[in-house]
Amino acid sequence: TAIADADGNTIQQDLSQVAGLALDDVEHLDQGQYRGLFSSDSLLDVVRQPSVMWLRFEPQMDFDNDQSKNHMKINTMRSYFTTDLDGSGQIVAVADSGLDEDHGDFGTRVVGNYEGIGDGSTADKHSGHGTHVACTVLGDGSKGGYAGVAPDAELYFQAMENDNTGNFVSPSLNYLLNTAYNAGARIHTNSWGSSATSTQGEYTSEAEAVDDRSFNYDKVSNGQEGLTILFAAGNDGPNPGTVGSPSTAKNVVTVGNHQARYSGAPDNLMSGSSRGPTDDGRIKPDIIAPGGYVRSCRAQEAQDIGSSSWQSTWYLEYTGTSMATPNAAGAATLIREYLIEIAQRPSPQGALVKALLVLGAQDINSRD
């Protein structure tokens, strides 16, 4: 890699060789980015290499229906037009822990189940978070009536949890989004993000990577269909400036949560929902959606479901922006279906879907 200084002079050094020599368990993420382990004793030696521009700790990523659809008026939207809106013809990508693909609510609509971290498994053995999230988007309710928002959409799943440890590992965001796009997904929903308080509100390299992909797919000159990307705002409220990365990205739909069941008005943020603004003054989250006590699919292999507030054989209840985000993703799926089938716009940009989702929401008249 040739790196030029202010005077135009360059130093020739291959960053991959530095990574190969300095790092254990080295992994090439994206162009100019490597991940791995090295001793703190080697820190100065690494940063002195001419091709190394910056270092940082690996960010820790965490996980951030019937009543939900009523709150979002989805049932009214589905039947308002001559053509019913149910997600038909749409592929939604869900990046999350894992998937119980054999849960009856997905039928034969799983078009891909991708293992993204190298542990050889796409199962959902711990909390069942990924199965719950995916079913909220597009489950058909065949096991007991808790159907998702877009029950005829197809699913491309990307598993990101290590079965052995339960740790959540984010692969390259460029690779994650590109893989889903190449599989036909045009909605990409993510109920996870950084749990580091030190980077809350910051526009990090992860946020930049997401914006890069969104911008690339939305460029009309590329002749490509747009990609709508959603991220959970996080569960670190009620203080301001608590939205984590990559939810701080400019082009994504950042989703907070309101109550979906029991007490609480839909126009009130739940206390734990992360608040904006971002460090550079942008409003986040962009929208709020039902995220309190959401009932959705229960992964049959899940072994750690003690945090759920209600359970049956096939369904359980979770709360958080993780639950709100797939509800919003389902709504985005119906919007995209509307644009293609009814408005006759065959390749809607992600920015257009985001704009209609935000402008179609009800103003709650408060940032709190």
Stretch-by-stretch model annotation:
Residues S16, G20, V47-S51, L138-S142, ...:
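Sec-exported extracytoplasmic/periplasmic mature domains
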Residues T1, L37-L43, M61-V94, I117-G128, ...:
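N-terminal domain-start motif of subtilase-like serine proteases
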Residues T189-S191, I229-G234:
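Active-site neighborhood of phospho(di)ester-bond hydrolases with catalytic His/Asp-centered motifs
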Residues T1-T10:
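Short, surface-exposed ligand-recognition loops at beta-strand->loop->(often short) alpha-helix junctions
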Residues G104, G244-T333:
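Extracellular S/T/G-rich loop segment that most often corresponds to the catalytic His/Ser-adjacent loop
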Residues N9-F81:
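Autoinhibitory propeptides
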Residues T10, S16, S79-Y114, G118-V169, ...:
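Subtilisin-like serine protease catalytic core
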Residues D96, V210, G234, G320:
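Active-site glycine-centered loops adjacent to acidic/histidine catalytic or metal-binding residues
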